[in-house]
Amino acid sequence: MKQFVASDIRNFAIVGHGASGKTCLAEAMLKIGGEINRLGTIEDGSTTSDYHPGERSRQISIHSTPLHMEWMDKKFNMIDTPGYSDFIGEALGSLSVVDMAVITIHAVNGVEVCTETMWNHASKLGIPKMLVVNGLDREHTKFEKVLEQARKRFGNNVFPMQLPVNEGPGYNKNIDVLRSELISYKEDRSGQMTESELPEELKERVKDLHEELIEYVAESDDSLLEKFFEEGSLTEEEMREGIHHAIQNQTFIPLFCVSATSNIGVARVCDFISKYGSSPDDRKTIIANDEKGSDVDVSLDGSETVLQIFKTMSESHVGEFSLFRVYSGKVSTGKDYHNTNRNINERFGQMFILNGKNRTQVDQLSAGDIAGVVKLKDTHTSNTLCSGKHVTLPALDLPSPNIHAAIEPSAKGDEEKLAVGLSTLHEEDPTFIYRVDSEVKQTIISGQGELHLTVTTERLKRRFGIDIALEEPKVPFRETIMGSGSAKYRHKKQSGGAGQFAEVWMRIEPKQRGEGIEFTHSLVGQNVDRVFVVSVEKGVKTACSDGILAGCKVVDVKVDFYDGKMHPVDSKDIAFQTAGKHAFREAFLSAQPCLLEPIMDIEVKVPEDFMGDIMGDISGKRGKIMGMDADGSFQVIKAQVPQAELYHYATTVRSLTGGRGIHSESFSHYEKMPKDIEKKVAQERQKQEDE
């Protein structure tokens, strides 16, 4: 395999909203790059990147897929990413390791929610962006409207490098603004084209656009700007260097016109990426932490190896497969590298560059490149491996889950298989999280949306043979008291032979929220042997764990065991545990008991037009609006809402906003529940126990 220096590598992610043509654009690139012989299609499940069963059956991308090709003596490392927010972690993880974002826009639908999400994340990461309007051969396309929308959302410096001449069915002609020429494409999906002079009616507009482009390029560099003011133009070489510089500074955002399924306009996109796109050379250093936690620079030109795992896959015939990017030094088969996150050494076996499920073996990789390695023992997504000095790169910036469900295997005895399956799927997709909640006695899975969780359950069945059902998670309500109470409880049991006897006198009072259970004793005299204090405490802890009102954990109570009675023969540990448990129960019921419910902090980011609907829905969920902030064309609504009201809230937000809203949630505090709802919860829990 040919070795490429960093300046000849182009690492980019193809991102955008679902169904905006990302996979088809990648497929067309592979076709003109000679990596495939024919264009696959979404409909017949034959594209290179969507090769997993779930992707083919649903006709959407679910996984990020690395691809590669050569174009104009440059190596393209492309990552085709999912566009639906349920699988956003795949796209965000990919953006973290590339040098450029190619953002697709649907030629009919225009800028959509995940278009904006990807734009914002690429901006946050500081990587250059370019836009590709795809599907211009469809009915009802309105290029000028899409261009206007892109400028409104992303800035007036969005600049059309091309203009479609005959958009809609039969589309096969573009104006190349940079070269001021007409390009006509063959309609056989070959991508072949002919160049000719501009039509007379378009010359004036293209002239104006070309001059505007020169101004953008000049603004990116002081020396070019000075020459532009002096001479009024730039040479072709100055334009070439200036465009690259302008792309890095995002002085302007290039926008291209294509129909990927017809292979129209794709070659010029590749030309532009090859000539002007970002290379690893454009960001030679990345910040890492040394062993003391101090910031250090990792240089592209460094001799010591530093790489990061950005995705883990599990393949049936090879086991785990780790995708990585090299940030410094070289990586070679058979060499050992130190995992600084887990403090272990890993020997690198076979390495491959990939086009979907097709692999080409490589023995060595240089800084700036991307590849995969098989069968690392204990290395996971986001981990850093290095030689020489031990450094750790920042973890990938991935979103927190916003939807949760409880699961249970349909067949008894599948618990061990389920644990293995959940662990494997989490390693492959860190935005999928699972935990065993001992408080509500359920296994809870969390993800980015209903489809995310549904696809995960399908993968558990297909790969591990486990059938599971999704159900609403139980809410971890808590029980406490609002006042003081006391009780005297005698436990006496006689059934022939040794009996049981214990009497416990107890008083309780409320503590501040979050202070937990405090058990004390104030015994005086010899009524109760002090050895039984621990027994009473065990009984109290059992009562607190089992719950009293609704079978929920008891919190924030001070307990004082102040007196009691014992029998010289029949008093024993189990007797005082039982008496302690029942004394606490009676005292609790006399102390104004109540239920507490978890309150969540939520942030909902929506276009201004949808604020009223979202705020009304929050109020209907017993929520409190805590504030609002502007974020560009969006509003961020901050609120506190009971957890019990938030099941499927991610779906509600998408429904209310036409898919343009997103939300995040995190635990805030516990709060007293309204009496009418408390009564319903207690009755429901009692019903569940009776069943």
Regions found by a protein language model. Name each.
Residues 1-691:
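Structural and coupling elements of P-loop NTPases
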